[in-house]
């Protein structure tokens, strides 16, 4: 289990503030700790579920 993102196979997730998109394993977790990626960031868009608009994405690097 990821120390930054406590996710069970089923059910909800609890993410720490340090959780990054790539460390999130399930939908509710991604929603709670991923920012929305800018248009054109294909790599980020594949792994993130947006919760809001942002010009930066932590998993886009």
Swiss-Prot record:
Residue numbers binding a divalent metal cation 7: 50, 57, 59-60
Q: Which residues bind a divalent metal cation 2?
A: 7, 13, 15, 26
User: Organism's domain of life?
Assistant: Eukaryota
Per UniProt, where does a divalent metal cation 6 bind?
Answer: 37, 41, 44, 60
- The record's region (Alpha) falls at 30-61
Binding of a divalent metal cation 4: at which residues? Answer: 33-34, 44, 48
**What does the entry list as the binding residues for a divalent metal cation 1?**
5, 7, 21, 24
Chain residues that bind a divalent metal cation 3: 15, 19, 24, 29
UniProt keyword annotation of Zinc present: yes
The reply to whether Metal-binding figures as a keyword in the UniProt entry is: yes
One biological-process term from Gene Ontology? Answer: cellular response to cadmium ion
Key words, A-Z: Acetylation, Cadmium, Copper, Metal-binding, Metal-thiolate cluster, Phosphoprotein, Zinc
Q: Which GO terms describe its cellular component?
A: cytoplasm; nucleus
Where is the PTM N-acetylmethionine found along the chain?
Answer: 1
SUPFAM superfamilies listed in its UniProt record: Metallothionein (SSF57868)
Residues modified as Phosphoserine are 58
The subunit structure is: Monomer. Interacts with FAM168A.
The similarity annotation says: Belongs to the metallothionein superfamily. Type 1 family.
Q: What does this protein do?
A: Metallothioneins have a high content of cysteine residues that bind various heavy metals; these proteins are transcriptionally regulated by both heavy metals and glucocorticoids. May be involved in FAM168A anti-apoptotic signaling.
Q: Any notes on this protein's domains?
A: Class I metallothioneins contain 2 metal-binding domains: four divalent ions are chelated within cluster A of the alpha domain and are coordinated via cysteinyl thiolate bridges to 11 cysteine ligands. Cluster B, the corresponding region within the beta domain, can ligate three divalent ions to 9 cysteines.
Please identify the protein, giving its name as recorded.
Metallothionein-1X
Write down the species. Homo sapiens
Q: What is the lineage of its organism?
A: Eukaryota, Metazoa, Chordata, Craniata, Vertebrata
Name the gene behind this protein.
MT1X
């Amino acid at each position: 289990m990821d120390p930054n993102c406590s996710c069970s196979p089923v059910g909800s997730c609890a993410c720490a503030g340090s959780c990054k998109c790539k460390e999130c394993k399930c939908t509710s977790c991604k929603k709670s700790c991923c920012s929305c990626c800018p248009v054109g960031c294909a790599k980020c868009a594949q792994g993130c579920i947006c919760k809001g608009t942002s010009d930066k994405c932590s998993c886009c690097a």
